[in-house]
Structure formats: structure tokens, C-alpha cells
Amino acid sequence: MATKAVCVLKGDGPVQGIIHFEQKANGPVVVKGRITGLVEGKHGFHVHEFGDNTQGCTSAGPHFNPLSKKHGGPQDEERHVGDLGNVTAGADGVANVSIEDSLISLSGANSIIGRTMVVHEKPDDLGKGGNEESTKTGNAGSRLACGVIGIAQ
């Protein structure tokens, strides 16, 4: 079983970063990292279904959702497995990521290994936006940067 994973985020613009994932036994996954080049504020942060970046971040498909649920926030019962909420960039354009999540995993049915991590243009409304798009994407807008999550040492 993989206990560590890493993802290098890249996009067409200035946004880039490195995200580390670590899981002990059947515990939560600890997600830590740094993303630079962002506009100040909140940005949706999701694991998407496919590890396919052949056409940039668009070929990563929808949010990773093996349980066929509606989009939600990381604390919600009704959420995609890949819904990790938002990262927040300061005035310097840097988001320091520190998330602990019990739904994603580095093994088994909810494994995120080989899938794509995406940082979005806009804040994720956590499924509370009152329209259909909110229940799918959280109205998080375009995909600024992405990368495939791979097994790490």
C-alpha cells in the first residue's frame, strides 16, 4: 500500500505548485504543499477522475466521484470523494496547503493515485450556490493548474 504520494501542479499561466500526500494505516490523508502564482483569495481544490493531462487540465474529467454523489464541501456527508474545498492565496499569490481528509485514500476504492489534482480560478461554493453547476463543480471556474498524483518514496 502506498503511504506517500506527490503531485506537481502546472498550467498555461503562472500558477504552479507541489502537493504532498501522506496516509498512515487506515487514517486520514494529510495533504500539504504550496501553490504560487494565484490571485489573492479562495480557489477550488479538487481531485479529478482521470490522470489524463494530454489536453491540459480539461482532459482530467469531472471531480472524482465513485459514490455518485452531488458536489459538496469537505465536511459534508453529500460530496464527491475528490471535493477538498478551497485553498486560500495571500496577497503574495501563495497558498500554503494543509488539509486532512478521511474520504480520499492512497489505496483501495477511493484511491487518488493516478488521478489529477486541480486548482481552480474561483472559490468553490461547496455545493451551496443554488444552481445546477454548483452541485457538479461548486462554480469553481476554469482549471488554472493540474498534475497527476503519483506514488512517492
From Swiss-Prot:
A GO CC term assigned to this protein in UniProt: nucleus
Lipidated residue numbers (S-palmitoyl cysteine): C7
Cofactor binding mode and count: Binds 1 copper ion per subunit. Binds 1 zinc ion per subunit.
Signal peptide span: none
Top-level taxon of origin: Eukaryota
Residues annotated with Phosphoserine modification: S98, S102, S105, S107
EC number of the protein: 1.15.1.1
Locations listed in the record: Cytoplasm; Nucleus
CDD domains, per the entry: Cu-Zn_Superoxide_Dismutase
Disulfide bonds: C57-C146
Residues where Cu cation binds: H46, H48, H63, H120
Enzyme class name: oxidoreductase
Modification after translation: Palmitoylation helps nuclear targeting and decreases catalytic activity.
Cofactor entry: Cu cation; Zn(2+)
GO molecular function list: copper ion binding; protein homodimerization activity; protein phosphatase 2B binding; protein-folding chaperone binding; small GTPase binding; superoxide dismutase activity; zinc ion binding
Residues at which Zn(2+) binds: H63, H71, H80, D83
Reaction catalysis annotation: 2 superoxide + 2 H(+) = H2O2 + O2
Keyword Acetylation: yes
Modified residues (N6-succinyllysine): K4, K10, K122, K136
Keywords recorded for this protein, A-Z: Acetylation, Antioxidant, Copper, Cytoplasm, Disulfide bond, Lipoprotein, Metal-binding, Nucleus, Oxidoreductase, Palmitate, Phosphoprotein, Zinc
Modification N-acetylalanine occurs at: A2
Subunit annotation: Homodimer; non-disulfide-linked. Heterodimer with SOD1. The heterodimer CCS:SOD1 interacts with SLC31A1; this heterotrimer is Cu(1+)-mediated and its maintenance is regulated through SOD1 activation.
Record's function text: Destroys radicals which are normally produced within the cells and which are toxic to biological systems.
Family classification: Belongs to the Cu-Zn superoxide dismutase family.
The protein's name: Superoxide dismutase [Cu-Zn]
Organism: Cavia porcellus
Encoding gene, per UniProt annotation: SOD1
